[in-house]
């Protein structure tokens, strides 16, 4: 196979000690990359690159299985998941495994089985990675033409893209099948405080599903993050599955149009940069989704959202003071605004005090108390249920802040510095990883464009100006 870049052209760029370092027969002279460039050394050996990716998948699946078993071994049934530092069991609980009414974990055996299945899968992937790295053919196209590829073969690259899209579509439909036919999923909006149920009537109306994409990302609109019912969520996965599978078939059967051939850089590093950009975007969206959405990420498992904890505090003190005889409808706070209840500028009745900024919160424990124009005073005076009080009191002291004392008006327990919400972990990790993936996209995109334009990679250290300068002393 013709090599896109001269392999020896750039090896002088590295420091001299790299010239003598060789891993698996791949030195800087033979590949154009130093040992620390990792898989870049495997750009032109598709079989070994496959081995690296399969082994990487094995490591990921091994961590998932081992960490799941670790969380199962440390699980305490008397405490909620979010108070135990669990970051994997909440996902499994959301899928409806081992969960009862109100989000109570009633059976951890499914989690044990899932953890073991992941460990077994990781062993298979690990063996495959070792085989393709050490024993299998170096170049797939010589032994298995169907699996071989040339980075510059635009038709083959879009075919591979199509296969990936079909696999993503199948993944979306797996959730749909689980929700509709195999045990259902956990719905935090189910009456009485949440329960596992089948989603029998997913939303298929394109005006509803794609209407989320046309919403403003600000305030109460919330773009796609504003999904607040399981019918829309599962219906969205049906649409995404159809689009991904349809797009995959399209890319397999067609060749890139002329404008696409001219617009994109067609090299291994360019495809890496495109992938990093996509992952970065998904990371940033997931970050905001986890932080604000309590439908896809139920508060019973992930802990309350920040706005939810704040509104829960206002609600808890309203309940307390109302029992002590306070008229919560007319009481004034220190600023002259309503202490417990007030009207928003549009006239909607909302909680007063510092939590007024979170007026757009929607939560299962609060919605039964709303009327046609915000919070219903009659319901607040006569229809607050014990389960709503208990849940609000719990959420009030478990805000995803990691703070020792009150921040933003949210009360915390005196030992709350020991509590870090899984919602905080997920949000922060997705933001940080999304940021670094974006930086990596810029890095690799710049390198790919420079290589395509024929620019020099790096500096020729034999002719650096500093070498001809006088010593400092």
UniProtKB/Swiss-Prot annotation:
Record propeptide residues: 1-14
GO molecular function per UniProt: chlorophyll binding; electron transporter, transferring electrons within the cyclic electron transport pathway of photosynthesis activity; metal ion binding
Biological process according to GO: photosynthetic electron transport in photosystem II
Mode of membrane association: Multi-pass membrane protein
Chain segments annotated as coiled-coil in the UniProt record: none
Keywords, sorted A to Z: Chlorophyll, Chloroplast, Chromophore, Manganese, Membrane, Metal-binding, Photosynthesis, Photosystem II, Plastid, Thylakoid, Transmembrane, Transmembrane helix
Pfam families: PSII (PF00421)
Disulfide pattern: none
Residues the record lists as binding [CaMn4O5] cluster: 367
Statement: the UniProt record of this protein carries the keyword Membrane: yes
Gene Ontology annotations for the cellular component aspect, listed alphabetically: chloroplast thylakoid membrane; photosystem II
TM spans (from-to): 69-93, 134-155, 178-200, 255-275, 291-312, 447-471
Comment on bound cofactor: Binds multiple chlorophylls and provides some of the ligands for the Ca-4Mn-5O cluster of the oxygen-evolving complex. It may also provide a ligand for a Cl- that is required for oxygen evolution. PSII binds additional chlorophylls, carotenoids and specific lipids.
Subcellular location field: Plastid, Chloroplast thylakoid membrane
Family listed: Belongs to the PsbB/PsbC family. PsbC subfamily.
Further comment found in the protein's record: Although originally identified as Cyanidium caldarium, these sequences derive from Galdieria sulphuraria.
Subunit and partners: PSII is composed of 1 copy each of membrane proteins PsbA, PsbB, PsbC, PsbD, PsbE, PsbF, PsbH, PsbI, PsbJ, PsbK, PsbL, PsbM, PsbT, PsbY, PsbZ, Psb30/Ycf12, at least 3 peripheral proteins of the oxygen-evolving complex and a large number of cofactors. It forms dimeric complexes.
Function: One of the components of the core complex of photosystem II (PSII). It binds chlorophyll and helps catalyze the primary light-induced photochemical processes of PSII. PSII is a light-driven water:plastoquinone oxidoreductase, using light energy to abstract electrons from H(2)O, generating O(2) and a proton gradient subsequently used for ATP formation.
Annotated protein name in UniProt: Photosystem II CP43 reaction center protein
Biological source species: Galdieria sulphuraria (Red alga)
Source taxonomy: Eukaryota, Rhodophyta, Bangiophyceae, Galdieriales, Galdieriaceae
């Amino acid at each position: 196979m013709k090599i896109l870049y001269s392999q020896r052209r750039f090896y002088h760029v590295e420091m001299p000690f790299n010239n003598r370092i060789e891993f698996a027969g791949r030195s800087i002279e033979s590949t154009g990359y130093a040992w620390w460039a990792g898989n870049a050394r495997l750009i032109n050996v598709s079989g070994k690159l496959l081995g690296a990716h399969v082994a990487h998948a094995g490591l990921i699946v091994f961590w998932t299985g081992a960490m799941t078993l670790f969380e199962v071994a440390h699980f305490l049934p008397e405490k909620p998941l979010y108070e135990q530092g669990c970051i994997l069991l909440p996902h499994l609980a959301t899928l409806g495994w081992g969960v009862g009414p109100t989000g109570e974990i009633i059976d951890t055996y499914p989690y044990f089985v899932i953890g073991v299945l992941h460990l077994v899968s990781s062993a298979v992937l690990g063996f495959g990675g070792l085989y393709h790295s050490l024993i299998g053919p170096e170049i797939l196209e010589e032994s298995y033409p169907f699996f071989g590829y040339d980075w510059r073969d635009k038709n083959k690259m879009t075919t591979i893209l199509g296969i990936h899209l079909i696999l993503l579509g199948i993944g979306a439909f797996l959730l749909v099948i689980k929700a509709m036919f195999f045990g259902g999923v956990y719905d935090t909006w189910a009456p009485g405080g949440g329960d596992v149920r089948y989603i029998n009537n997913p939303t298929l109306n394109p005006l509803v599903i794609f209407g989320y994409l046309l919403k403003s990302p600000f305030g109460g609109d919330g773009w796609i993050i504003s999904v607040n019912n399981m019918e829309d969520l599962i219906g969205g996965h049906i649409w995404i599955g159809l689009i991904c599978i349809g797009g995959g078939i399209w890319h397999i059967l067609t060749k890139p149009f002329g404008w696409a051939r001219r617009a994109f850089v067609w090299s291994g590093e360019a495809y890496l940069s495109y992938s990093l950009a996509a992952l970065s975007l998904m990371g940033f969206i997931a970050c905001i989704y986890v932080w604000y959405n309590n439908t896809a990420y139920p508060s019973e498992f992930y802990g309350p959202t920040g706005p939810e904890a704040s509104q829960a505090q206002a609600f808890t003190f309203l309940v307390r003071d109302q029992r002590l005889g306070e008229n919560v409808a007319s009481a004034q706070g220190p600023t002259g605004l309503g202490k417990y209840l007030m009207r928003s500028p549009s006239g909607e009745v909302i909680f007063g005090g510092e939590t007024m900024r979170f007026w757009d919160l929607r939560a299962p424990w609060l919605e039964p108390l709303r009327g046609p124009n915000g919070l219903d005073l009659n319901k607040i005076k006569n229809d607050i249920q014990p389960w709503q009080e208990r849940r609000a009191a719990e959420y009030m002291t478990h805000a995803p802040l990691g703070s020792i004392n009150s921040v933003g008006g949210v009360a915390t327990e005196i030992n709350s510095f020991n509590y870090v919400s899984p919602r905080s972990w997920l949000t922060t990790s997705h933001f940080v990883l999304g940021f670094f993936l974006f930086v990596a996209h810029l890095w690799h995109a710049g390198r790919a464009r420079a290589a395509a334009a024929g620019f020099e990679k790096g500096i020729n250290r034999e002719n650096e100006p500093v070498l001809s300068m006088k010593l400092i002393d």
